[in-house]
Amino acid sequence: MIDRVTALARASFGELLKRPILLALPGIALALGAVTGGAIAYAPDDAIVDALRQYEPSLVTRIHGRDGEQYAEWLTQRREVVAYEDIAPVMVNAVVATEDAKFFSHVGIDPLAVVRSLIADIRCGYFCEGFSTITMQIPRNLDRYLGGETWLPKSKTLTRKIREGIYAIQIERHYTKEQIFAIYANQIFMGSKVYGFQSAAKFYFGKSISDVNLPEAALLAGIIQTPNSFRPDLNPERAVRKRNVVLGRMLAEGFISDEEHAVASIAPLVLADEDNADGIGDYFTEEIRKRLITEYGMDGIYRGGLRVNTTLDNRVQTAAEVALDKGIRAVDKAAGWRGATTNLLQEGADLETWVHPAWFDRIEPGNIVKAVVLEVEPERARVRFMDQVAELTPEDIEWTNRTRLHRLVEPGDLIEVKLKELREDGTWRLLLDQEPTLQGSVLVVENHTGEVTAMVGGRTFDQSEFNRATQAVRPTGSIFKPFVYSAAVQRGITPSELFVDQPETFYDASRQPYSPENFNNEYIGITSMAEALTKSRNVPTVMLQQKVGLTNVIDTARSFGLTADFQPYLSLGLGVMDISVWEIVRAYTVFPNQGVLVEPHLVKEVFDRNGRLLEEAERQARKVLSSDEAYVMARILVAGIQRGTGVRAKPLANELGLMLGGKSGTTDDRTNTWYVGFSPNHTVGVWLGHDDNQRIHRYATGASSALPIWIDVMRAAEDGASPAVLPMPNNIELRSVDVFTGLLYSEYCKESVELAYIAGTAPTRTCGPTERSILDLPPYQQTYFVSNGKLDTDGG
């Protein structure tokens, strides 16, 4: 019998058409009987059923922040699996009425539909009418995952139909109707990358499939046959017409009343609001994606339906992205107006009709948009963006330090403008802006847990996916100095150790001279070790490095987790080695963390599609400094914000009621600027620079360019935090000392600072009139009064 069926199936329609239709009917009946009988008698081992049991549909991997809210996803197909009970009955009825009216009564195939279809096909000479049931569509829809043409031929032949029928009957033997419908409902393609009714309901209507109403269910059912043709977001009129066809079928099948049909047929199409929210944490998410690919593979993360719980704090991440963009733009403007890079007239464009793709985005005050210059006069420039025409005046270009518009722009220039405010007459007040060439990165780590709450690897992920927080290594400048000073504290040198800050030449092991210079060539004479770090003095730092020993400094730096190829250069302590933001921030957490280095991490937990825990972050920590040593260093860095290069952050410390500490860094030729600092709860690092290592601008410093960004980010990280200080070990003594001599403070001293000392190492002498008189001498004369790091009032 099977041979006869196969022969019939392989017969061409041309041969069938040569026969009278009545002669063909016995063959049709024979084919129909063969389909049913063959399915029952000859189907090998229910192979389709075994495959279905092993089948795992492609699911969306969802990325959640620490608050549990989803903020990103990875997918090839947007699908959420739901049970039959979670599908609204009206949705079931709409699909059954449209796709398979006898679904709940047939055995997988509809014999009468088969006969009707074959007769129509013979008359047409090709497959002009289908007879698929919902059950028959399952192997077709799953074929991609069940072996391709091993299961069903791609071509539309009678052989394929017979196989579909056999598989359908096998499926019906082992699954209930409800189970079959659920398989179908979770697998069906619904346009775009949307698969399954649940995802379709959320995508088009912003609701669960359990909550759809009659017109919505009918519209979804109408999408099934040709999804992209009837997508309501792309073809609303066609989608509504198709919806009404489905409603007609539901009425004909008795699923709805005449009144329900009439009301639903005129229901307005109401779709979910388009999600205009900008994505956050692109660099953060990409870093996770790269790591998880090595663990679970591409299929695992794009089809596996994982739930990834991350350490990202949505609020802090958003603040970091905004702060970096704002800070970069401010620093970039300080470098001056570079001029427009594109002129549309030179490209042959019509200025009145040219459209920028971003003009279709929602606009509001504060946005920065592209605008076309239409006309220019010395004190006025007319520009167009979207359907708006506005003017720029001299006060709108104030940051350029120019007043004549015609010397800045010309007709056809494509420029950036900031929407300052919408006036009462409906026109916009604009400010001239420019696309920055500067880049930067931000990293925020929770001290005690190592959780990374925010990471920004560049100004715009769409323009550059290179992560400057993890992948870039740059010279650090003075933010490396705390590791030199830590090496000193480890070896018993106290914050009151004295140096004479003046020009000096040092010689390396090969007798090569090295003459470091202070910032702006300023020298102050006698200074304490703490003050040298607080005010970022280069010469005393090299002196301290020589006293500690280059090898010891390198060993200490490596113990902090810094992996640069350190060489014993005399310039080492001034930050000539290339280090990443990730490593520097990780190292700085040691100071507020009682000497413990905690490995930063981005992922807290990963679960599979069934909720089974695949991995969970474990706190990885090791001791780098003793609690006493860490506290001594932390208090010196706190002084850096109270009165040093980070003093701009002092109001923030007062505002938050938190002890803040940190260090700025600026490299030679001002090509890199840094600020890294901490609170009792978080450590934040900021870097700015160009990818091609060109100078930022001639006045750029870490304190002027990176620190303002750091302040904004730290404020967000600590929002809502209770006032706190760093926990002080029992073996620590606090003393108010003179910043220059390191002696106990008195009225004769110039300035005081509160510093920490390990018990038994605090100064016992008080600064008096003699010490004050020494400080009034020129630096070269002060040298005679410093011996072995201490003040000798007898002059040696």
Feature locations, PLM:
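Non-catalytic structural connector segments
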Residues: A252, S257-I363, E379, E517-N521, ...
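Peptidoglycan glycan-strand catalytic modules in the bacterial/periplasmic cell-wall system
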Residues: A31, S58-V60, H64-A262, T460, ...
